[in-house]
Each structure stands twice: as C-alpha cells, then as structure tokens.
A protein has these predicted regions:
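Hydrophobic face of amphipathic alpha-helices that form TPR/SEL1-like repeat modules
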Residues: 39-46, 50, 75-82, 86, ...
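TPR/TPR-like alpha-solenoid signature
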Residues: 38, 74, 95, 110, ...
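Terminal, low-structured helical/coil segments at or just beyond the last alpha-helical repeat
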Residues: 2-17, 149-187
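Short helix-capping/linker turns of helical repeat alpha-solenoids
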Residues: 30-33, 46-48, 53, 66-70, ...
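N-terminal segments that cap or nucleate solenoid repeat domains
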Residues: 2-46
Length: 187
C-alpha cells in the first residue's frame, strides 16, 4: 500500500524534475527542509533512484511530518497502518492520518472516513453513533474535493443514520476549518 502511494507521488512531483543528488538532498534535509525530507522519504520508500529502505523512508517522513508536511503525514500514517518500515500501530496511523486530513488532504480525509466507518460497524457499544457521524463528515469533505468514491461512501453512510445524525455530520463538515501547514522554506 505505501509503495504504490510513494511511487505515485514520486512520479507526480519528482520524476519529471531534475533530481538533486543524494548528498544534496541529505544536506537540505539535515538543515530541516521539510520538502527535502519528504523527497528522501519518497526516494527510499519507492526505491526509485536509491535502494529501497522503508525504515529510512519512515525516518524522513517523520522528520517532514513533524513540521506539518501534509503528504509526509499521510504516507507515515499509511506506513503505521500497514506496518511497513515501522511497527504496525493503528493509534499512530490514525493520528498521522488525522493531521493530514485536517490540512485538507482528500486522500487522508477519505482514509479517515473509512477508519471511522469500520468503528461504526464493529466498534465498542456506544461509539457507533459518534463514529458514523465522523465517518460521514470525512467522506463529505473528501467528496467536496472530488476524491474518488467519497461521494458514494458518504451516501452509503446515510442509509444507517438518522436524519439528526446526518444533520450533525453536515454541520461538522460545514464548520470544519483547515489546519495551516508549516512551510519549512519560510524559516
């Protein structure tokens, strides 16, 4: 799962651009450049241009994610969810996914909606209603950005929800405010 996402982002952003050599990337990443850290995560995660090393990918994603780099947070969340490069940890996966989702990443929003949906159908008693509302909210937000399958997932959620729950989900989506990312290049 992570490797496909890594390869996607690598092709989208880095494959067409001239690649800085590994030494220059490490230098910039070591100085705290979140984009360089994210780029190293992609390079190590995909094995494109470097030997594939998921532990190194996770290390560099965490460095960038700690600076609120949205895509690094998303990829780190995927790594924790799948246990690739880091020990599998659903709590950490959810934490990093939420951070990316709160910055407006539609993929993270959809993923978070899916995570809440799983709780709504098989979670502890009492958590189902809150999980349904949160799943609906995150699917709705991802659908508003045109993210594939989100609109259908949002609509499917309504079949198991009361009107009040749907209204609450709509209210939460309407009052959602993005978290501002930190740009490491502004320092």
């Amino acid at each position: 799962m992570v490797t496909g996402m890594d390869a996607f982002w690598y092709r989208k952003f880095f494959a067409r651009a001239p690649k800085p050599d590994l030494k220059a990337s490490n230098l910039a990443a070591g100085r705290g450049d979140a984009e360089a850290q994210f780029g190293l995560g992609l390079r190590y995660g995909s094995g494109t241009g470097e030997a594939r090393d998921l532990a190194q990918a996770a290390h560099w994603y965490r460095q960038a994610a700690d600076q609120n780099h949205c895509l690094a947070q998303f990829n780190l969340g995927l790594m924790y969810a799948s246990g690739q490069g880091v020990p599998r940890d659903e709590g950490e996966a959810g934490r990093w996914m939420r951070k990316a989702a709160e910055q407006g990443d539609a993929g993270a929003q959809f993923n978070l909606g899916t995570r809440f949906h799983r709780v709504s159908v098989g979670g502890p008693p009492g958590d189902e209603v809150e999980a349904k509302i949160e799943a609906y909210k995150w699917f709705f937000l991802a659908a508003a950005q045109g993210y594939k399958d989100s609109a259908a997932s949002c609509e499917r959620m309504t079949f198991g929800m009361t009107r009040e729950e749907v209204a609450e989900g709509n209210q939460r989506a309407a009052s959602f405010e993005l978290t501002k990312p930190t740009d490491s290049l502004d320092r």
